[in-house]
Amino acid sequence: MAPTALLSVSDKRGVVPLAEALHRLHGYQLLSSGGTAKVLQEAGLPVTRVADHTGAPEILGGRVKTLHPRIHGGILARRGDPAHEADLLEQQIDPIDVVVVNLYPFRETVATPDVSWDAAIENIDIGGPTMVRSAAKNHAHVAVLTSPEQYDRFLKALSGSAGGVNANVRRQLALEAFAHTAAYDVAISRWMQSRPELQPDVEAAAPAEALPWLEALPLRQTLRYGENPHQKAAWFSSPMGWGGAKQLQGKALSTNNLLDLEAALATVREFGYGSSGLHPAQQAAAVVVKHTNPCGVAVGDGVGIALTRALDGDRISAFGGIVALNAVVDGPAAKELTSLFLECVVAPGYSSEALEILAAKGNLRLLELPPEAIDAAPKDHVRSILGGVLVQDLDDQPIDPSAWTVASQRQPTTAETADLRFAWQLVRHVRSNAILVARDGQSLGVGAGQMNRVGSARIALEAAGEQAVGAVLASDGFFPFDDTVRLAASHGIKAVIHPGGSLRDADSIKACDELGLAMVLTGRRHFLH
């Protein structure tokens, strides 16, 4: 009896060449359903439809096609087992040797921000995962393919082995199949948890540990290397968030590139992003990042002006940096981007003039990330620790100046209040202990990652230099002593903002009053580790 391959795919890339090779080179009979059968027949291949094979028509609008003993018996039967072979003979079931199935595009469907509950539910595959799991369970006798990326590898293994692919290949394919269905189920659960339609009573809610919070993610690409060249790395991503980005030019991405891009994007989104989506840009903004810390941030009348001001904040540190822009890159911005060596740029889009200019920098990585991809991404912040992960809410709540209090005798001026808000928006994106000096919508100096707060302040103030005179200073945590306030005043800082809450707050407030500084307390800390 000729071997049989069952093909039923949503992603039809490569399915015709695969079926041609199976049938014409290796003598497989082809069994298929629905749209896949139509594609194969149009390619001139002899196909038996599943409905003809089982004697049962597709019903319920296609919800039931392959859930039939003649399908699953053929997949699950152990070859050489007398009892199984007797059952096959009695029920007139033919063995199925290769199962090629990929699933309804659920993740792609729910990546659309306005997707309805019913539309998403209709894209939950039932028959597909059942066939995949059946074939993976019986991998001792059946090969299962769940992605077009596997086809060439499978055909190569098939050509190099008489009597079908060897057990090691089938075992590896089974592993990949179970990973595929696991990721699919977690994606469904994850999406349902996020929906307003699902509001269970407290008594009916499952324990938190029973709900999968982390979506199993498919491999997006193997990276050049990890944080260092001797470390291997890979990027796993859903179609949402960074998975929705398109790289327009440049070298392959590294781990550090993605970490810096993430930091830059989070910072520039403080000012909105793009012209569509949930939070469109209200003002053009630019961010330059090095080692996940912003070294230059600015707003301006146009993305080119914002970029120039951001780079001017610290052009020495900007060399080799990562840039995020919240508006379409135009010609002037592109010219500024070519003025120094940069690793990556991310923006919601690029004009044709900008792309022509930037093409001269062939190694510069240009990424286009639409606002809709950002809006659809999960809101959890996840980090790994040895043997586990930590999950927390993103620190992206809107800034609320109405919750602030002025602790000093002197009230900040209108201009100082605007600068304090700008600095407070940014300091939460700087590694603790974090200090940021700013004025007129431009960062002037950043102190990051020091083990004591006054050390970070010293770095930020020295970076700002003479521009610190009349500027403001923000701190992500409270001042444990009055030394930071006194240092700030000695450099000409006129107002400071911090969470407050130190046992020695009174000392810092007293120093502000002595030195004529305004002090604002926000009541909210913004540590970043």
Curated annotation (Swiss-Prot):
Entry keyword annotation includes Nucleotide-binding: no
CDD domains: IMPCH
Any single GO BP term: 'de novo' IMP biosynthetic process
Keywords: Hydrolase, Multifunctional enzyme, Purine biosynthesis, Transferase
Pathway linked to the protein: Purine metabolism; IMP biosynthesis via de novo pathway; 5-formamido-1-(5-phospho-D-ribosyl)imidazole-4-carboxamide from 5-amino-1-(5-phospho-D-ribosyl)imidazole-4-carboxamide (10-formyl THF route): step 1/1; Purine metabolism; IMP biosynthesis via de novo pathway; IMP from 5-formamido-1-(5-phospho-D-ribosyl)imidazole-4-carboxamide: step 1/1
SMART domains referenced in this protein's UniProt entry, alphabetically: AICARFT_IMPCHas (SM00798), MGS (SM00851)
Assigned GO CC terms: cytosol
MGS-like domain sequence ranges: 1-146
EC number, UniProt record: 2.1.2.3, 3.5.4.10
Catalytic reactions on record: (6R)-10-formyltetrahydrofolate + 5-amino-1-(5-phospho-beta-D-ribosyl)imidazole-4-carboxamide = 5-formamido-1-(5-phospho-D-ribosyl)imidazole-4-carboxamide + (6S)-5,6,7,8-tetrahydrofolate; IMP + H2O = 5-formamido-1-(5-phospho-D-ribosyl)imidazole-4-carboxamide
Organism superkingdom: Bacteria
One function term, GO molecular function aspect: phosphoribosylaminoimidazolecarboxamide formyltransferase activity
Family: Belongs to the PurH family.
Domain text: The IMP cyclohydrolase activity resides in the N-terminal region.
Name listed for the protein in its UniProt record: Bifunctional purine biosynthesis protein PurH
Phylogenetic placement of the source organism: Bacteria, Bacillati, Cyanobacteriota, Cyanophyceae, Synechococcales
